[in-house]
Amino acid sequence: MDAKELHLVIVSPEKTVFDGPVKWVDFPGESGRFQVLVNHAAIISSLVGGEIKYQCGEAQFRVKRDIQTLNIKGGFVEVNNNKVSVCV
């Protein structure tokens, strides 16, 4: 993974939902939707019910060309050094 991509990990109590490179991620935050791009400032935020959207990175782009979505009831996200960790 180069500096042009984020590494996204989404976990639930049952399983790892996604673990791989992405171009961007869009979240349902308590104060409204927000998007995380490469080199985003470090944050920790709570998430509300809604839809997480993300575009797969170059390594997976040939297989998954569309924007991927995941419906959640809530959770938390941490962003640090281009790694995005989500617990839903």
Q: Where do the protein language model's features map onto the residues?
A:
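Short, charged, intrinsically disordered terminal tails
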Residues: 1-5
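Compact, glycine-rich, soluble single-domain proteins
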Residues: 6-88
